[in-house]
Design a protein with these regions (language model features):
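Short amphipathic alpha-helical segments
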Residues: 28, 84-86, 172-174
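Donor/substrate-binding cores of folate-linked one-carbon enzymes
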Residues: 1-80
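Acyl-group handling in specialized metabolite and lipid biosynthesis
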Residues: 79-92
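An anion-binding loop in the catalytic cleft
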Residues: 90-207
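Short helix-capping and hinge/turn segments at secondary-structure transitions, especially at repeat
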Residues: 55-65, 86, 102-109
Length: 207
């Protein structure tokens, strides 16, 4: 998800001395949805993996299993997920950050800093610049992003609405839809904004 892949999958293989180098037996592909999260993909892979294990055992028992050598090309291994990986670099593009948010949901989660506190971001959408450049309204006050806009420093809030706010990235803006503050439950951004003040020009990412 983080790397923007559209397909993943599960493979059963024969054990040997190497790391994931044994002959392949069966495999199945799983398409990655546009709104896929690490948690939803984990559940899909777990279900597919269990079914594939049963199918593989039957094939071995019936002596119909076909063992296929892996390609000679270098193997790419996925890096371990760590909490530090979730620290959002707002200089990256909105698309990259959205993928990070989805890929690290539910563990270890993507996060940024606000007033010296960690704010986890559980749901966000990458949006074109112009979608957050329009005049928006929060309560009885009107806000406009004209004073910030696409020339704002990455991490800067460029617009605030009743149910979301947009943060400038290195390319595009990220609309924040679900967050969590320390000691609090996850909440949609509309609920968050009723208890926390977010204004245009505010900068996220500073510890």
């Amino acid at each position: 998800i983080i790397e923007g892949e559209s397909v993943t999958g599960v493979t059963t293989m024969q054990m040997d001395e190497g790391l994931d180098t044994g002959d392949m037996i069966l495999k199945t592909e799983i398409p990655i949805a546009e709104d896929e999260t690490g948690e939803s993909l984990h559940d899909k892979l777990a279900e597919a993996g269990a079914a594939l294990c049963v199918k593989t055992l039957h094939a071995i028992e019936n002596k119909t299993a076909v063992f296929e050598k892996q390609p000679e090309s270098p193997t790419a291994y996925a890096k371990m997920l760590t909490k530090d990986l979730g620290n959002i670099d707002w200089a990256k593009s909105a698309v990259q950050i959205e993928r990070l948010v989805r890929g690290l949901n539910s563990w270890p989660s993507a996060y940024t800093h606000r007033d010296g506190k960690v704010m986890k971001i559980w749901k966000a959408l990458a949006k074109p610049q112009e979608e957050c450049a329009e005049q928006t309204e929060l309560g009885s006050e009107e806000h406009t992003a004209q004073k910030t806009g696409k020339n704002a420093m990455p991490g800067t809030v460029v617009s605030v609405a009743k149910d979301s706010f947009c943060i400038q990235t290195g390319d595009g803006v990220l609309r924040i839809l679900e967050v969590q503050m320390p000691g609090k439950k996850r909440m949609d951004t509309g609920s968050f904004l009723r208890g926390y003040k977010v204004e245009e020009g505010m900068v996220f990412g500073r510890e």
